[in-house]
């Protein structure tokens, strides 16, 4: 069994057999470790052992972070490979901590703070807006680059995108429509690329925490197994080459987000996104949806919150639904009758 499959298997056992607290911790660690793949990084066996001790309640997340930090401080003869592993280990532990925290504020300042907390001591510019323009060669674009925001317009662009999103109303939208909009928002702020490095990981953590404010339960499998796909999907959402018939599209990102928060089963393959890929039989826009007692894709967020509680407890009373969701009794009755 490969090292990658080994950590996935070991952490999955806590989800299958663990207590509720262990499940939540394991999911956070799986997402945290999987996200390192967006920059081609892999975590160490020591990180996995530390994660397991945290999941089992033997140490706190702060103690886990201190262990990882101390482990690398003692290893003064590190190779370049170990330096990359150090970054992956430290950042994984920090992501796990952030995902375990309920606190969140929707603002550019929050995104900058997340970046600082993830990369402080790893990058000298953690949490700081870049002061120069950048390009990045992308495999999915045959070596071409996305056009990122100019460094001197980053702050204004961030403020505009966040203000626009804050004013956007999700009321009466189906969950599927919400996914499309969230994918577009994620691709827009990622294109700004406000940081010198670590943009995709910071974007992922920010979006996970933002989506949780809507009541979505994030499926850790998506980031655990498809982090590089996530990055390539962001790239394709922001790249045009009209001369060669290539248009920016969020369809790949929408499929990823749909798997992430709705539990759909789109096949996420990086080769499908390559600009040279041609397939007339590309998978349908209609996904495979796991069997459920209700169609979540057509629900509004308000309806989904109520239906999820009914699905978990079919005998739940209307007054309990009112208390759990904060909705009015008339709203709860309307949803139950629809």
Enumerate the predicted regions with their spans.
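FIC/Doc superfamily catalytic core
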Residues: 1-338
């Amino acid at each position: 069994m490969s090292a990658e499959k080994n950590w996935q298997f070991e952490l999955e056992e806590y989800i299958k057999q663990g207590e509720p607290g262990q499940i939540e911790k394991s999911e956070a660690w799986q997402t945290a470790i999987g996200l390192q793949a967006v920059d081609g990084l892999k975590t160490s066996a020591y990180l996995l052992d530390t994660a397991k001790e945290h999941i089992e309640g033997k140490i706190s997340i702060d103690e886990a972070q201190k262990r990882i930090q101390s482990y690398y401080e003692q290893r003064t003869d590190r190779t370049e490979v170990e330096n990359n592993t150090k970054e992956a280990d430290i950042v994984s532990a920090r992501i796990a901590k952030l995902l375990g925290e309920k606190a969140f504020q929707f603002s550019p300042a929050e995104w900058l703070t997340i970046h600082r907390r993830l990369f402080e001591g790893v990058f000298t510019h953690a949490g700081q807006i870049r002061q120069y323009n950048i390009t990045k060669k992308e495999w999915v674009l045959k070596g071409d680059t996305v056009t990122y925001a100019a460094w001197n317009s980053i702050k204004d662009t961030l403020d505009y995108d966040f203000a626009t999103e804050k004013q956007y109303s999700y009321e009466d939208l189906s969950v599927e429509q919400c996914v499309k909009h969230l994918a577009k928002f994620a691709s827009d702020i990622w294109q700004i690329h406000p940081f010198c490095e670590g943009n995709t990981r910071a974007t992922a953590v920010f979006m996970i925490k933002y989506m949780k404010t809507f009541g979505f339960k994030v499926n850790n499998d998506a980031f655990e197994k498809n982090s590089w796909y996530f990055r390539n999907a962001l790239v394709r959402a922001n790249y045009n080459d009209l001369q060669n018939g290539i248009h920016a599209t969020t369809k790949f990102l929408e499929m990823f987000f749909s798997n992430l928060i709705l539990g759909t089963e789109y096949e996420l393959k990086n080769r499908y996104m390559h600009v040279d890929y041609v397939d007339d039989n590309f998978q349908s826009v209609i996904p495979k949806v796991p069997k459920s007692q209700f169609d979540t894709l057509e629900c509004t967020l308000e309806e989904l919150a109520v239906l999820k509680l009914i699905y978990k407890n079919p005998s739940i009373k209307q007054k309990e639904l009112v208390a759990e969701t904060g909705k009015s009794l008339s709203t709860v009755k309307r949803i139950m009758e629809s």
